[in-house]
Amino acid sequence: MEDKNNIELQEKAPDNYNNNNNNNNNNNNNNNNNNNNNNNNNNNNNNDINNNDDDNNKIIYQNPTPASSSHIDSIEIDINYDLSNHIKQRVTQNKTGMFVSANNISYYIPKSIKKGESEELSKLYLLNNISFTMKPGRMILLMGIPGAGKSLLLKVLGNRLGKGKIEGELKFNNHEVDETTHQRDTIFVSQDDRHIALLTVRETLEFSAKCNMGENVSQEEQSERVDLVLDQLGLSHTSNTIIGNQFFRGISGGQKRRVTIANEFTKRSPNLILMDEPSTGLDSATSYNVISKVKTIAKEAKASVMVSLLQPSVELTNLFDDILILGEGGNLIYFGELNNLLPYFSSIGLAPLPNQPLAEFMQEVSVEPSKYMITDKIELSSKDGGDDESKSLLLGGADSGNVEKMDLVKLFKESELNQKTIQSMQQLIPSDIKVSDHLIKKLETGDNGKSSVRYELKHLLARHIKVMKIMKMQYAVRFFQAIFMGCVIGSLFVKMGFTQADARNRFGLVYFAMVLHIWTTIGSVEEFFTLRGIFDDQKDSKYYRNFPYFLSLVITKIPISLIEAILFSSCCYWIAGFQARVDNFIVFILGMALTNLIAQGIFQVTSAFTSAQLLASLICPAIVVLFMIMSGYMISRLQIPGWWIWLNALSPLRYVIDMVSSNELYGLEFHCSPMEKIPPSNYPLLNVSYADGGYQGNQICQYSTGSDFLNQFGFSDNSYMRWVDIVIILGFVCTFFFIFFLGVKYIRFENKKPPRQIKLKKKKEKKDKKDKEVKHKWNGCYMTFQNLNYVVPSVKDNKETGKKEKVTLELLKDVNGFIVPGMCALMGPSGAGKSTLMDVLAKRKNVGTITGDIRINGQLVKDMNITRFTGYVEQQDILSANLTVREAIEFSANCRLPSSYLQKDRVKLIDEILSVLSLTKMQNTTIGPNPTLGISLANRKKVSIGIELASDPHLIFLDEPTSGLDSSAALKVMNCVKKIAESGRTVVCTIHQPSQEIFEKFDQLLLLDKGKVIYFGDTGDNSSTVIQHFTSAGYQYEHGRNPADFILEIAEHPPSTGQSASDYFKSSIHYSNSIQRLESKTIVPEGVDVPKYKGKYSAPATAQLHSLVKRGWLNHVRRPQTILLRFLRSFIPAIVIGTLFLRLDNDQTGARNRIALVFLGFLFGGMASIGKVPTIVEDRSVYYRESSAGTYPAHLYILASVITDLPMMVLTAFSYWIPMFFLTGLTLGDHGWKFFFSLSVYLLVIMCYDSLATLFALTLPTIPIAILVSGVGLNFLGLFGGFFIPVNNIPRGWIWMHYLVFSKYGLETLSITELKGEPFFCEEDQYSIIPIAGTNFTKKYCAIQSGDTMLLQYGMNDAYDRQFYNLIILGGYFCAYTFLGYLALRFINHMKR
């Protein structure tokens, strides 16, 4: 770049700078005098995008060197030149572009009406009779109040309609919308930034380019497009950084927004560009940069553009050619050229207020037209001799007393401007133009813009495999679990023999292995919901067809299922001693893999047809457990009542267990041990003579072959049926995945919902006008820091040895400064150390080493409980979704204010906070889980600030308070912050690229670069002090430029030669003055007290507990759908089980089924507990934030959780046990004591399951891993509880585990309660027939004549005396799990700083 032209231009820089000063001043004056001259003035601006002059497309600034240097280097930045050339090379000369005409279009949603009502009421209109045109090369700015229909209009133009219908005429190049090409030709940037968190920026854009550009475009051209987009949107330096989310740290909110924009701009033919609030999260300079590039694309590619913006700056507004304003109800207020906007509104008697931004006027004129009536101009014209005709023109015929009732819609509809628009539609474009006339170069003949299914599938698989590689830890846990559980189960059934018990154990092992492979896949629910929003966006943009996406999900699951099955089977099969045949082993592996795929199918189908992950997590376990019950193991198919036999046939698990059981047992011979023969060896009548009623020593072995056992359960007793079962199972798998495909293709849940309003009863209070004023005046803090250094341990690759070695990274280097009451900005480029410095000052770092001196009001911070008088607003707005705005702030106040604060003072404080933050109108609105389903991003940030203000702090830290906000929302937030600072507090903000208006609100600035200070001091009036510092160093500042952008570019582009910015600062007067003040200790004024507090927490424990319990309860009751599902999830299975075992008799079957009933109740309890894991993990992040702020201690959080969860546990226990108990006819006992006792025991078991799931959720890092480990825990509880394997048959090496699991004590207690002393009998077909040797006689034998016999078989006969003690043991388990959960919460933090 350093050619002669550049050098010549650099030498003239000082003169140009002075000229620019004068020109800009003149332009500013013109702008103030007449708003209508904005466009003309901006044409003179060097940054005007419409000017193609090379000089005007370049910003020149100088690298710093000492002021005396004779040579000054420069850096030249070309804004849109590369982009323009790139487009020109690819656009045909005769390209016409896309003309859009909308003639009286309306959009409505059909709704049901009552008989007799008008048909008009059956249509809910969201857009109403809108007419406008879009022309290639022109840009339309779409404005309107929230809810006016801006997003909806863009979706209509983008052919992204929901359930509604369109009326009117909408044509593209005089043709109806072409479903096959419209999305390919249209760039649509939605409001939501939804990306795969673990992919890098480049990987995300490469995938978009492959989908958008198609298989006919070379890899080189795709890569070139990605590089161009990265460069044009300023993402090149973050191209290899992952996107990130709340669990994985990645790029910033503003950068995510730019990635969303970049995704769409990888398309080949941008003929129609639609952007829905693209500036959200971007500062004003970046917003201007992005829209200016869109302007270039519009001109060079002949694209038609419509962009909705929320209060854009004047410079941004002037980039647009036309304005379209929507009013309430989706009505058109104005459409026309920007130059005609003010004259039109003036003609109807309306105009902006003095010094009011034009965007604000456009946004609000439809709400309060009376506010903008030109009364003063009318009076002025009268004084100046203006005639009546001019007055009439200004008022537009409106009655001055009724301006607020003006029908702006009707006025515009009848205006000459609108009539011209309608007339122009007839002559917009030639009638014979083809839709294909606007295509870009290099499209082959016959190319319809679609890639082949094979191409789409290939890249979808590649993307999914990338994500799987990144998530290798999760899959490693699954594989390790498969090996571990294979060894555990194998060793538990080690080398099974051929006794009767060994035969039954084979069934138990098969069933349990099947259950294990079901619960390892439940994490797919979370995976589906993570990808759903991304898929919906890409589906709308026609990135790929539904089928390749569905196929990629299925294909990537098959190898995982197969590997998991092989690992498990290789351990379990051979250790347990199954048949040593290759075909049997392969069938066993196939059985486990198919079980895995069946579970995947069930979970995916449920997820596709439910709206939220929590609902799917509640429903999935209930469905799977019903299939498990009907599999034929828990209750034989021969015993299932006729009204439920169809469910047995529909249970895919029935065919799995049939296949694997027949595969193992068919062809085997079994015998009886002495105690297994009938009658048993210890039976009193065994050796008694037949004449005396005995058996004369005769015994039989009831089952001698594997077929006998298979027939007992109703399973197939042949070898070929296993292959038939495999085909049937594959049919189920295909059916489930086909239904899943239908759900993916046709089911779409609309995410946009208005935040919920909570109606609260207001107490009547006498209002005093004085109370509206902010009465509190705080004494801010004076913070000083000297010689501050911060190092962290790290690992680095040694290039010489190739090994990793431990190193230390110095993140802060010799930082000195002080902060006084007011606002101080911590600024610097990415990685400069802004957030690090603030965390160090706020005592928030939990890793690394800090050295130096930090004091507040003269006292060392390390000796202070800083959370008592400081507030810290984190960058991520982690809020309780179900609380209202007021309740969230009130919760913080009640937990963090001392008891000396009277209730009326708390209410006043909260009212003041709401007023200062402009949240009063929405104080009773629920916050919601995210900006899509709750309050906006800006209001969420305000609530975060309000929560910290509720602690009445003297010093407030704010980490990137404008992150993710557009320029207007950021300004509103910072206005609130300024009010806070003006109340006497000290405010410290990290902030990245603020607008000029925001930057000038700060009193102090500390600028960092790579951990070093390059400026510290006052900002000065209009930032004059900081600008003077850098201009004196040789940097050139252009008048009118944002000072924040100026100093950040200095930090981002250090000089290649000469003195560094940090060295120059150390030689400056600012540095010497600050060091002198620090050393002389004159910063803290006399009389300023040191904050002194006793204890870590301000509020008493009772107040904190009360607030936590109240919040926890509101979290439950404001999710009525979840409560209903909890009830139905227990009640429906209870009805199924109750009718399955309806009115149990005291026969042999009834005896065995009683214990099975108890175990099934445990199974449901365990499944129910897994459903709460996602909620706990999400709520955990709220605790981390509040704990860091010193809101309450961990033990109160756990205690409150127990108290508020207890009613839900009672609901779960009662809604299952009560209907099941009475339907099955279990024994009531005297005065019903057995019923109440068993209900109490079951409740304790449910509490143990819930507390164990809570422990896993608090201990483990992510939802999938927590659910996976919870499943393993449930497997252990079932395996060692004493049902699958009676305690007498558990190997000696595992007996300790039997006594360790709480399910043992619950099963034992309930079984004894139900069976002890209960008589049983045999039906005629249930007797065993014993032949008497040497005679022709036989004698019947009834195996179970008393419940004690069943208890003996399960090894529970010695536990009679422990029946009531087990209640204490179960309570102890609940307390132990709760205490371990407290320790996990207290000492394990998955959000590292």
From Swiss-Prot:
Keyword field: ATP-binding, Membrane, Nucleotide-binding, Repeat, Transmembrane, Transmembrane helix, Transport
Comp. bias intervals (Low complexity): 15-50
- Localisation: Membrane
Residue ranges of the TM segments = 479-499, 509-529, 558-578, 585-605, 615-635, 640-660, 724-744, 1122-1142, 1157-1177, 1206-1226, 1235-1255, 1265-1285, 1364-1384
Q: How does it sit in the membrane?
A: Multi-pass membrane protein
Organism expressing this protein natively: Dictyostelium discoideum (Social amoeba)
The ABC transporter domain covers 100-353, 783-1035
Which BP terms in the Gene Ontology apply to this protein? Answer: aggregation involved in sorocarp development; sorocarp morphogenesis
Classification via PANTHER family: ATP-BINDING CASSETTE TRANSPORTER
Residues annotated as domain ABC transmembrane type-2: 473-698, 1121-1388
- One MF term in GO for this entry? ATPase-coupled transmembrane transporter activity
Q: Where is this region: Disordered?
A: 1-68
For this protein, the record's CDD domains field holds: ABCG_PDR_domain1, ABCG_PDR_domain2
What is the recorded name of this protein? ABC transporter G family member 3
Q: Where does ATP bind?
A: 144-151, 828-835
Query: Which cellular components does GO assign to this protein?
Result: membrane
Positions with biased composition (Basic and acidic residues): 1-14
UniProt superkingdom: Eukaryota
Return the similarity comment: Belongs to the ABC transporter superfamily. ABCG family. PDR (TC 3.A.1.205) subfamily.
Name the predominant localization.
membrane
